Amino acid sequence: MELFAEKRILTVSQLNGLIRGVLEENFEQVWVEGEISNLAMPHSGHLYFTLKDAGAQVRCVMFRASSRALKFKPKDGMGLIVRGRVSVFEPRGEYQLIVEYLEPQGIGALQLAFIQLKERLAKEGLFAETHKKPIPKLPQRIGVVTSATGAAIHDILNVLNRRFANVQVLIRPVKVQGEGAAGEIAAAIRDFNRYREIDVMIVGRGGGSLEDLWAFNEEVVARAIYESKIPVISAVGHEIDFTIADFVADLRAPTPSAAAELVVKSKAELASDLDALSHRLVLAMRHCLEDCWGDVNGLTRALKDPSLLLGHLAQRVDDLDERIKHAVQVMLLRRKEKAAFLQNRLRLQNPALQVEQGKELLLGYCARMENTMERLLERARQAAAVSAGKLHALSPLATLARGYSIVRKLPDMSVISDSSQVEPGDLLDLTFQQGGAHCRVETKHD
């Protein structure tokens, strides 16, 4: 009987692989809540973070295929509820949670995404009143961006036909919910701006859940409305529904029907507006006539006593005459002073005077230059004489004149200054002051 069973030795990789298999098999899907920390979002699109509570923590990873579906942006410190499976990162032997879905605690993911986008766009100024464009009073052509089969388009057309049947309506059908809806809505808004065939635009749909209305909360739609040169009226959902599009639009209507009522007045309202304008015009004309009659009466009263009017005019003429005389005297005095100043400057700047002064200066410069050159030449002569004397004293010719000669050894013509440099029989070249001679060495002595 064996005391111990046969040992099964595992490598570290095998051990981690076995643990991973056990965990993934028994924790295929779990829901975990906690606070997010150490969030990292590299360019790969994956999310890496730690989920923790007061007593423990676990590493989590959410791969790009899952993270790209998030409607909101996770942040450190945010409470989350996550769904995922437990696995092991074998190279480090660490267990982790592979997250497939997450949502914020206490508030839905879509609601949080709505709040985050609203705050960001508000900081950028997309909701500012200064950017809102006025809605035209009597539009001739109206563009509508909505579903071609929904109730919204029927409500809009019914109201427009009932209130003012002559207005033209251009419909740009789009998807208003589901994947790709936001892109279609934004493209339709830009198309209307590209062709500029309408005076005002209604963008909307009927009511629904937050998920149904979500296309109108997408950033791409908000920016298309903000960039539109054509006034935009948002008409999304019911009265209680607010979307990002409502905040960016130039005017918000609680329903599509209300949008049609806002953009086109009824015939009765137009008639009432015309009556009001007529009444205001009559009042303005009456005030204008009253002002004119007041002016006429004032002139009539003034003409009843012409001497009074002429007296005021004569007094004003006298005053103006005195002011003109004084102004002329001041002007003449200033002109005289300026003329005297210019005459003095002209005298000082007389070309003949300047030429004479220049001539005198030039003659003085020439005399000084001649004296200077004479002194320099004399110094140069003296220096040359001294140098010539020194050169003559040092010249070999002067030495030869005293009876000396220059001895060179043939054939290399090397100068001989010592008897040790020659041997009997050597040929020598002798140079005298005048001419020279060749000789042979017979004997030498020290």
UniProtKB/Swiss-Prot annotation:
EC number: 3.1.11.6
Catalytic class of the enzyme: hydrolase
CDD domains for the chain: ExoVII_LU_OBF
Pfam families: Exonuc_VII_L (PF02601), tRNA_anti_2 (PF13742)
Predominant location: cytoplasm
The reaction(s) this protein catalyses: Exonucleolytic cleavage in either 5'- to 3'- or 3'- to 5'-direction to yield nucleoside 5'-phosphates
MF (Gene Ontology): exodeoxyribonuclease VII activity; nucleic acid binding
Keywords, alphabetical: Cytoplasm, Exonuclease, Hydrolase, Nuclease
Cysteines joined through disulfide linkages: none
InterPro entries: Exonuc_VII_L (IPR003753), Exonuc_VII_lsu_C (IPR020579), OB-fold_nuc-bd_dom (IPR025824)
One Gene Ontology term, aspect cellular component: cytoplasm
A biological-process GO annotation: DNA catabolic process
Places the protein is found: Cytoplasm
Domain of life: Bacteria
Record note on quaternary structure: Heterooligomer composed of large and small subunits.
Family, similarity comment: Belongs to the XseA family.
Cited function: Bidirectionally degrades single-stranded DNA into large acid-insoluble oligonucleotides, which are then degraded further into small acid-soluble oligonucleotides.
Name listed for the protein in its UniProt record: Exodeoxyribonuclease 7 large subunit
Encoding gene per record: xseA
